[in-house]
């Protein structure tokens, strides 16, 4: 009688731990159910930080193998050499406005809705009929001319550098800046069309000739065109948002149009121009934070402040001259409630405050 067959034993390879599996390493937050690959600015990370920080990494953060993309005949990724400014940590900058995809659509949608309601109500109430001819001519020539400045800066200044900075946080802020400019230019264009349809005396095409040949606007036009020729993205941002916008943009929008419109029977224009001023306030907010970070950098702060002073010496005299070139338009409204000198003084005061905030020396010529 044969012996019963022995049960067959299965053999398994021995388990060998390689420390490549999940949960292999112990570190301070290894047992936490939440994980951040960056340090939030506050106790909890915001949605802005979650969708923005390190979306555009670099070899100093996470890309240990170096840039994984680039042009065949150029440097890879986003070279820091695209600006003369230097930073110990470009990723330190976080947009104080916390702009990301959702906020762009939400904020711009709200502004477009506001402008649309304003224009609809103006036509329904025949608000333009109460305007005097001098004010109608002022809007026809000057607000239309400023539309070209906004469009040019949005399309050829900010759009051109919205992927030049070394971090996604800076590029997002610049991209939103471009969207602000283009949307405001569009609002002014729609306003121009509405006035052309509502008032026979309003020439909706006059702004072209004014922008191209009116003596008072040629210095401003030259400034916008010169800005487009700057190759350094940080210099372009500095000269646009810190110098030009303060001495020319805000001077025209805030210190003239917003001040005299109501006295000339116009309550529509301040609503539209006010959206542009609100946009610029947000754009100035991120610009101030960025240049403040660079000016106070522990390693490169001194060199950056010298660089900013050099940019200031190159652009301030021209911007000041261009601001004074606009002086004739202060005499065009029928009700001249503000003078050019008082408007310029207010603009200079705000400009000095911005320079102080980013640790840039105030030019001696500012007080002359």
From Swiss-Prot:
Function: Component of the propane 2-monooxygenase multicomponent enzyme system which is involved in the degradation of propane via the O2-dependent hydroxylation of propane. Under acetone induction, also able to catalyze the oxidation of phenol to yield hydroquinone.
Entry protein name: Propane 2-monooxygenase, hydroxylase component small subunit
Any Pfam family the entry gives: Phenol_Hydrox
Molecular function GO labels: oxidoreductase activity, acting on paired donors, with incorporation or reduction of molecular oxygen, NAD(P)H as one donor, and incorporation of one atom of oxygen
Induction: By propane and acetone.
Enzyme class: oxidoreductase
Assembly description: The propane 2-monooxygenase multicomponent enzyme system is composed of an electron transfer component and a monooxygenase component interacting with the effector protein PrmD. The electron transfer component is composed of a reductase (PrmB), and the monooxygenase component is formed by a large subunit (PrmA) and a small subunit (PrmC). Probably requires the presence of the chaperonin-like protein PrmG to ensure a productive folding, resulting of a soluble PrmC, which leads to the active form of PrmABCD.
């Amino acid at each position: 009688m044969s012996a019963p067959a022995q049960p067959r034993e299965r053999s398994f390879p021995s388990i060998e731990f390689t420390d490549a599996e999940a949960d292999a390493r112990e570190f301070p937050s290894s047992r936490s159910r939440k994980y951040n690959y960056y340090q939030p600015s506050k106790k909890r990370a915001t949605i802005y930080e979650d969708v923005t920080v390190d979306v555009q990494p670099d070899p100093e953060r996470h890309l240990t193998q170096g840039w994984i993309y680039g042009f065949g005949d150029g440097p890879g990724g986003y070279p820091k050499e695209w600006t003369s400014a230097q930073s110990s940590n470009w990723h330190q900058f976080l947009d104080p406005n916390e702009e990301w995809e959702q906020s762009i659509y939400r904020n711009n949608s709200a502004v477009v809705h506001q402008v649309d309601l304003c224009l609809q109500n103006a036509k329904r109430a025949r608000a333009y009929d109460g305007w005097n001819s001098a004010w109608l001519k002022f809007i026809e020539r000057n607000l239309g001319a400023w539309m070209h400045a906004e469009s040019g800066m949005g399309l050829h200044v900010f759009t051109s550098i919205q992927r030049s900075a070394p971090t996604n946080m800076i590029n997002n802020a610049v991209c939103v800046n471009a969207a602000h400019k283009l949307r405001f230019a569009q609002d002014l264009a729609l306003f121009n069309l509405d006035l052309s349809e509502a008032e026979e005396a309003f020439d909706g095409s006059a702004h072209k000739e004014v922008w191209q040949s009116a003596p008072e606007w040629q210095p401003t036009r030259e400034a916008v065109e010169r800005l487009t020729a700057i190759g350094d993205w940080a210099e372009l941002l500095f000269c646009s948002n810190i110098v030009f916008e303060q001495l020319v943009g805000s001077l025209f929008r805030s210190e003239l149009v917003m001040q005299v419109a109501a006295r000339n029977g116009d309550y529509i224009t301040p609503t539209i121009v006010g959206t542009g001023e609100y946009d610029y306030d947000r754009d100035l907010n991120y610009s101030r934070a960025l240049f403040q970070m660079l000016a106070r950098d522990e390693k490169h702060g001194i060199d950056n402040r010298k660089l900013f002073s050099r940019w200031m010496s190159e652009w301030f005299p021209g911007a000041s001259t261009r601001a004074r070139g606009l002086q004739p338009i202060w005499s065009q409204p029928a009700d001249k409630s503000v003078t050019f000198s008082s408007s310029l003084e207010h603009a200079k005061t705000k400009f000095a405050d911005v320079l102080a905030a980013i640790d840039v020396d105030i030019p001696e010529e500012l007080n002359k």
